[in-house]
Regions:
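Beta1/beta-strand and adjacent pyrophosphate-binding region of the FAD-binding site
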Residues: 2-14, 31
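Flavin-dependent oxidoreductases
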Residues: 17, 180-294
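Gly/Ala-rich phosphate-binding loop of Rossmann-like dinucleotide-binding domains
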Residues: 19, 23-24, 163
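Glycine-rich FAD pyrophosphate-binding loop
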Residues: 23-45
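Dinucleotide-binding Rossmann-like beta1-alpha1 core, especially the glycine-rich loop
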Residues: 49-128, 133, 260-261, 270, ...
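Short beta-strand to alpha-helix junction loop
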Residues: 60, 64-70, 95-105, 143-163, ...
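Helical element adjacent to the flavin cofactor pocket in flavoenzyme catalytic cores
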Residues: 143-201
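Contiguous C-terminal substrate-recognition/catalytic subdomains in enzyme active sites
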Residues: 271, 276-336
Length: 336
């Protein structure tokens, strides 16, 4: 049986980069466990590809998150350039439609500067200034961030995995965690093929499956999760070049972890509108709303007995979910 100092479960961008940093900083025996045949086959590839800079993150509430977003920007850029991975820094404009939303942009300016951004990185433009930059954009005002743009995080994750392998990390692909046996000082991880390994320390980076993995360690038993699929519409060629930058709007539902659909200039040259947030029964329900009947029944049971049941009584949440569901079958609903 293989023995490791650290086992990381999940081969997405988070698990892969953690494996790289740990293998760079420490002389440890490390493995990364991934159930798929390669890294970054799920959320790390299936995303907008937008390069985010922390002008909207409150450093008092999310200090480490804001700091990581600020410091990692140039690291990702260097890695992209070294590996010929697309990195298009065309900028992002977050627009306000009225004076009330403009106040949110002013708040973002303060947060951005607290996070280390300069006046060259972010600025607020009025409607006339925006017209000069983007003639087809009609709004009250906008916050322009020059450091944002688009890349391919799936390719970046694979590049990081190669660096981690050179440091000695063992990538265990096609290894699906079946169950876990714990002792006082280590975890015995058993896989679907009944092979196993032991680790002194385990890091859970399983993305949409993180709660399922945690429960295999008999943690968070009373918690449940909800899964949402983000969908994008590819803009037709006759409208794809209406604007040159990513366009976001001030979120209408800041109390929920959803963004309104936005205008995305992809690193591959395509223009897309999205994403929405369509409720599905599992984190990998990419082509349908329902994976299978047992999965649906299990998810319903989790929701009505677990921590997410209170959302079912929130009328704002139910209204938002209904609109998101409609946007999955209607382009006009997505645009609206």
């Amino acid at each position: 049986m293989q023995k490791y100092d650290i086992a990381i479960i999940g081969g997405g961008v988070l698990g892969t980069t953690i494996s790289y940093w740990l293998s760079t900083l420490y002389d440890l025996k490390i493995c990364l466990i991934e159930k798929e045949h390669d890294v970054a086959l799920h959320s790390s590839t299936r995303n907008s590809g937008v390069i985010h800079y922390p002008f909207y993150i409150d450093p008092k509430k999310k200090k480490n998150f804001a700091r990581a977003a600020f410091l990692s920007h140039d690291m990702w850029k260097v890695l992209a350039n070294e590996n010929n991975i697309p990195w298009v820094q065309g900028g992002t404009i977050e627009i306000a439609l009225d004076e009330e939303q403009h106040k949110t942009l002013e708040k973002y300016m303060v947060l951005g500067k607290e996070n280390g951004l300069t006046e060259e990185d972010i600025s607020i433009l009025d409607s006339n200034e925006l017209k000069q930059k983007e003639p087809n954009l009609n709004c009250h005002s906008g916050l322009y961030c020059t450091k944002e743009g688009s890349t391919n995080y799936g390719l970046l994750t694979k590049a990081v995995s190669e660096l981690s392998k050179k440091n000695g990390t063992n990538f265990l692909l096609k290894h699906n965690v079946k169950y876990v046996e714990e002792t006082s000082d280590q975890a015995n991880i058993i896989f679907s093929d009944n092979s196993s390994l032991t680790a002194n320390f385990v890091i859970n980076c399983a993305g949409g499956n993180s709660l399922d993995v945690a429960k295999k360690f008999r943690l968070l038993k009373d918690y449940s999760d909800l899964h949402f699929r983000g969908e994008y519409w590819v803009a037709d060629s006759n409208i794809a070049n209406l604007v040159k930058t990513n366009i976001y709007t001030v979120p209408r539902y800041p109390e929920f972890p959803f963004l309104d659909p936005h205008w995305i200039k992809r690193a591959n040259g395509e223009t897309e509108i999205g994403p929405n947030a369509v409720p599905v029964d599992s984190p990998e329900a990419y082509d349908s709303f329902i994976t299978d009947i047992p999965t649906v029944l299990s998810k319903i049971t989790d929701i009505v007995t677990g921590s997410t049941k209170k959302l079912l009584l929130n009328t704002d949440f139910i209204s938002l979910v209904s609109k998101e569901f409609l946007s999955s079958i209607s382009k006009s609903a997505m645009v609206e």
